[in-house]
């Protein structure tokens, strides 16, 4: 009897949540269309590092910040604990012109959507309305594989001044990961508050441009350009490609085609443990 009462209460709770969610959807959708371009003439950029807790890379922060500051941006850095669902909802209001995201990403085969991970561990009791509407999803990152020499000597093949790979056999170690909340294109469309002001997005994570769903949602929200990966990518290649993109795009001021060509030359899929291409999606 107790279980039946509890079940009825839970069903009632979910029904009420759906009604509240519907009202919230309408309110947020209307509010989300408000523009937010009050930047006082200051160029602002941000590095959003969802990976930092599990895969820290302070030298990446330092170098990326240096490139952005040299290009005239004031730079903020947010790490795993800051990267929440609510953080992403408010992102357009923060008035960033250049947004670099270091993150786990994946594509949801069921909905044909790309999703970006937050730093929030998944719980079915949180973000109930967002889960019901498919604006956030449960996602598990690809297991990290740590490579180590299987023999006493390493056999490295030098490709160029900045890239080399190991030819001999390696031993692998798998590292378990948690489930996280991930944001979908529907969250960008429905729940982000404000508009981006011709913002450039660098989406550094697996499959962030495996299909254009997430990039298109950012473009519709006011972004001008989105770059990312068309497939799974190793962390070391991800970090190198992002830094090369910032160098060639901001410092050398190459156009997009030449910038991506330079990245392809230096981070060539032929030599990557997970072959992937750094590509872009622009406003038409």
Predicted regions and their residues:
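Short amphipathic alpha-helical segments and helix-helix/interface helices
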Residues: 65, 88-89, 188-193, 215-216, ...
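N-terminal Sec-pathway targeting helices
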Residues: 2-17
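A domain-level signal for caspase-like cysteine endopeptidase catalytic cores
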Residues: 32-155, 162
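Active-site-proximal C-terminal subdomain of hydrolase catalytic domains
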Residues: 199-284
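Cysteine protease catalytic core and zymogen-processing segment of caspase-like enzymes
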Residues: 108-226
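Hydrophobic single-pass membrane-insertion segments
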Residues: 24-34
